[in-house]
UniProtKB/Swiss-Prot annotation:
Forms with the serine/threonine protein phosphatase CTDNEP1 an active complex which dephosphorylates and may activate LPIN1 and LPIN2. LPIN1 and LPIN2 are phosphatidate phosphatases that catalyze the conversion of phosphatidic acid to diacylglycerol and control the metabolism of fatty acids at different levels. May indirectly modulate the lipid composition of nuclear and/or endoplasmic reticulum membranes and be required for proper nuclear membrane morphology and/or dynamics. May also indirectly regulate the production of lipid droplets and triacylglycerol. GO terms for molecular function: protein phosphatase regulator activity. The modification N-acetylmethionine is found at M1. Muscle specific with lower expression in other metabolic tissues. InterPro entries: NEP1-R1. This is Nuclear envelope phosphatase-regulatory subunit 1. It comes from Homo sapiens.
Length: 125
């Protein structure tokens, strides 16, 4: 394979990698917004739950029953983590990191957008 074909292959790989990472961005943004909203709801519900004087006087489950906003948002947050939201909000970074690991064997790397970074060849003497 000559150097022109190799350059074309590298450009095609870079185009596909940047396209894939770029396509992940909208979904990642939506997952991040969902995580932020549910986290804020859980924090707000927890604050209201903690400052309620009735919380100390009743049992734990009765207290949760009296604060459905906190209970539902907490269950939702736990469900989101079981569904893997912690991986979905950083999916492009995971893809880029895995590509860097593989590309390191070929003296290459990539940035977070998928652009290839060619490193100089080590001189063997």
């Amino acid at each position: 394979m000559n150097s022109l074909e190799q350059a074309e292959d590298l450009k095609a790989f870079e185009r596909r990698l940047t396209e894939y990472i770029h396509c992940l961005q909208p979904a990642t943004g939506r997952w991040r917004m969902l995580l932020i909203v549910v986290s804020v709801c859980t924090a707000t519900g927890a604050w209201n739950w903690l400052i309620d004087p009735e919380t100390q006087k009743v049992s734990f489950f009765t207290s949760l029953w009296n604060h459905p906003f906190f209970t539902i948002s907490c269950i939702t947050l736990i469900g989101l983590f079981f569904a893997g939201i912690h991986k979905r909000v950083v999916a492009p970074s995971i893809i880029a990191a895995r590509c860097r690991t593989v590309l390191a064997e070929y003296n290459m790397s990539c940035d977070d957008t998928g652009k290839l970074i060619l490193k100089p060849r080590p001189h063997v003497q």
